[in-house]
């Protein structure tokens, strides 16, 4: 998004906590401090005397040790402090789902704020609770998701929210109690220059690819493995490539052993964008079996690469895939196996689906379109802000046609 906004002629700063993102060289990265405890070998020993001078540092450390996830809250405190000094440099602040208390203070200071909610994390929490083996694990799930109390409160008070699909819009209204008039839809974009077809990359004859956090129930990997077991009877040489990390001793590893699929499934992680793109390009078919997605980025990326896609109807996936792929009921391994089998057996269908998928992403989900829609919304928000200030000061000029979002 930041690259697309810069391409459109706007000035963009990205304020980020750790781990810091890799950005277009034209985008200014402003690094917020933090303990980065998820990259530290022994978090219990990460606290230093200087951190005791910062409530955010101490709270982040204490929360990590007690099973919490404090980063949305502590990031908000740090950003609020930064913008107290530098907020005058910006026309608008766009939050990427931290939904922290600091946003309300920033908005009250007079700086326009818009927040993206990709989907309400209450969905993730419920799926994790449903999959929890015992009360102890359920307690840990609730503790880790404790930040949701803050996110729900903040979402209800923010004036401007962006979401990335109609399904997410419905879920935000239902799960977070946000008023419909607060929400504006802007579909996510796919980088169609990076994620693109390449005829020089040979498509494997019997390879399914998926992306998944191996033991995250939301992603539906278990459903795909069940489908894979059935398909191997028809396609003995069939293999599955999972872009994700296999947790030793976890539920996925146990299911692999139960289904006798250890030799048919490969996990890869820590790969570059170039490697990811080539995995999409070389797959016979890409499976997206998620039980829920607020958008469905892997499906869009695969389609942009010209790969045929079979997806579940979990969340917003049907909005992304449309009629360019095959959509089956979420959680139904038999339906998933049947659809994958159709594609694996028909090279003509593979080619047609690949071409239709690429065209759909180019027409509906490119970043230039997403950026254009967001800038239009930014200008609408800025216009409201100008009117509000004029009402407070008695001014009447409402021309904001030259306003620039940053």
Regions found by a protein language model. Name each.
Residues 201-219, 225-228:
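Conserved donor-binding/catalytic core segment of Leloir-type glycosyltransferases
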Residues 252-275, 285:
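Nucleotide-activated donor-binding/catalytic signature segment of Leloir-type glycosyltransferases, i.e.
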């Amino acid at each position: 998004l930041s690259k697309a906004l810069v391409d459109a002629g706007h000035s963009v700063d990205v304020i980020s906590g750790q781990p810091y993102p890799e950005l277009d060289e034209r985008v200014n990265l402003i690094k917020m401090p933090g303990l980065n405890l998820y990259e530290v070998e022994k978090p219990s020993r990460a606290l230093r005397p200087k951190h005791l001078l910062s409530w955010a540092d101490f709270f982040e450390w204490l929360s990590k040790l007690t099973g919490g996830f404090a980063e949305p809250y502590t990031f908000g405190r740090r950003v609020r402090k930064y913008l107290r000094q530098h907020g005058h440099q910006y026309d608008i602040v766009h939050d990427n789902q931290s939904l922290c208390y600091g946003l309300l203070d920033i908005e009250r200071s007079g700086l326009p704020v818009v927040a993206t909610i990709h989907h309400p994390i209450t969905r993730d929490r419920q799926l994790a609770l449903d999959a929890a083996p015992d009360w102890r694990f359920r307690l840990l799930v609730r503790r880790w998701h404790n930040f949701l109390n803050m996110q729900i409160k903040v979402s209800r008070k923010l004036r401007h929210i962006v979401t990335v699909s109609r399904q997410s819009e419905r879920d935000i209204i239902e799960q977070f109690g946000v008023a419909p008039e607060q929400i504006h839809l802007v579909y996510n974009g796919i980088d169609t220059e990076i994620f693109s077809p390449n005829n020089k990359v040979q498509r494997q004859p019997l390879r399914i690819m998926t992306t998944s956090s191996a033991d995250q129930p939301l992603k539906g990997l278990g459903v795909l493995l069940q489908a894979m077991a059935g398909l191997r009877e028809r396609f003995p040489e069939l293999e599955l490539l999972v872009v994700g990390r296999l947790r030793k001793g976890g539920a996925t590893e146990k299911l692999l052993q139960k289904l006798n699929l250890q030799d048919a499934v490969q996990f890869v992680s820590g790969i570059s964008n170039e490697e990811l793109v080539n995995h999409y390009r070389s797959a016979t078919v890409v499976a997206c079996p998620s039980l829920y997605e607020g958008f469905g980025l892997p499906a869009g990326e695969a389609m942009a690469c010209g790969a045929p896609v079979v997806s579940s109807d979990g969340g917003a996936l049907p909005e992304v895939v449309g009629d360019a792929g095959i959509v089956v009921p979420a959680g139904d391994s038999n339906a998933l196996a049947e659809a994958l089998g159709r594609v694996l057996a028909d090279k003509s269908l593979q080619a047609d689906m690949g071409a239709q998928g690429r065209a759909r992403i180019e027409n509906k989900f490119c970043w230039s379109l997403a950026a254009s829609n967001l800038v239009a919304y930014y200008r609408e928000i800025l216009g409201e802000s100008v009117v509000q200030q004029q009402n407070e000061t008695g001014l009447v000029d409402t021309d904001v046609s030259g306003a620039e979002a940053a």
